[in-house]
Amino acid sequence: MRKYETFFIIDPDLPDEVTAAVDEKIKSVVGANGGDVVSYVPWGKKKLAYPVKKRSRGLYVLMEYAGDSRLVAELERNMRLDERVLKFITVKLDDRYDPEKEAARMAANLPSFPEDEDTEEKGSAPLAREEEGIGEEAQTDEAEDKE
């Protein structure tokens, strides 16, 4: 199983009952295709960056789930056909998903991507090399003659 994240936007003008029905439909597609919903977080109504299907606002939802590529294809097919879903995007998070490790991580409240311990010790690499002579007066033969 792989872990995926789908971010989608629902029409904000829908009543709460219809929005709940869309949520349940999406979760049921994941369950019916052998997937597990890891987290489902509604972000609320927000202004869109640009109009989508003549809407300037949308109800944002972030869902993490585990499954295979057929599940992703079926979920995206259902979202494409559902007029209540304005936009969506799916991203693969992990190649291998272990439900036991995920449960332990959630219990410990750790991020799903561990930070590299070496980065704190090493610090960040300098972006550019400091070159000699930048910001300093260059000495020429003429400057020495005047003195």
From Swiss-Prot:
RNA-binding recorded as keyword: yes
Matching Pfam families: Ribosomal_S6 (PF01250)
SUPFAM superfamilies recorded: Ribosomal protein S6 (SSF54995)
Acidic residues biased stretches: 133-147
GO CC terms: cytoplasm; ribonucleoprotein complex; ribosome
Keyword terms: Ribonucleoprotein, Ribosomal protein, RNA-binding, rRNA-binding
Region (Disordered): 103-147
Keyword Mitochondrion listed: no
GO molecular function ontology, one term from the record: small ribosomal subunit rRNA binding
One GO term of the biological process aspect: translation
Function: Binds together with bS18 to 16S ribosomal RNA.
Family as reported in the entry's similarity comment: Belongs to the bacterial ribosomal protein bS6 family.
Protein name per its UniProtKB record: Small ribosomal subunit protein bS6
Natural source organism: Syntrophobacter fumaroxidans (strain DSM 10017 / MPOB)
